[in-house]
Amino acid sequence: MDHIKPSFHDVLEFVRMFRRKNKLQREIADNEKRIRDNQKRVLLLDNLSDYIKSGMSIEEIQAIISNMRTDYEDRVDDYIIKNAELSKERRELSKKLKAIGEVKALNSVIDKQP
């Protein structure tokens, strides 16, 4: 009976380590996203400072900001459309893979029959 306990303990340790690894991967991905977001903010401010010149009126600055906003909104829309297309392709592939798996499972059942 003693040999079962260490084995069970090993399984629990494996599960704990696997969960920790997954959590670390999620945290790394979150941090990478935050880094990208902040780098984009810095770039946005750099771009804005390139367009704004001394002596510009508030209306001119607001027009620049409005144009930049429109450009970014258009990009977001483009990415949403692209993401939808990719998701559709992924779903189609999942269906095909599932069908292939079902055919293989059926064939293995048929092959095992006497």
From Swiss-Prot:
<comment type="similarity">
    <text>Belongs to the pole-localizer TmaR family.</text>
</comment>
<protein>
    <recommendedName>
        <fullName>Pole-localizer protein TmaR</fullName>
    </recommendedName>
</protein>
<feature type="coiled-coil region">
    <location>
        <begin position="69"/>
        <end position="103"/>
    </location>
</feature>
<dbReference type="InterPro" id="IPR007458">
    <property type="entry name" value="DUF496"/>
</dbReference>
<dbReference type="InterPro" id="IPR053375">
    <property type="entry name" value="UPF0265"/>
</dbReference>
<dbReference type="GO" id="GO:0005829">
    <property type="term" value="C:cytosol"/>
</dbReference>
<keyword id="KW-0963">Cytoplasm</keyword>
<comment type="function">
    <text>Pole-localizer protein involved in the regulation of several cellular processes.</text>
</comment>
<dbReference type="Pfam" id="PF04363">
    <property type="entry name" value="DUF496"/>
</dbReference>
<feature type="coiled-coil region">
    <location>
        <begin position="21"/>
        <end position="41"/>
    </location>
</feature>
<keyword id="KW-0175">Coiled coil</keyword>
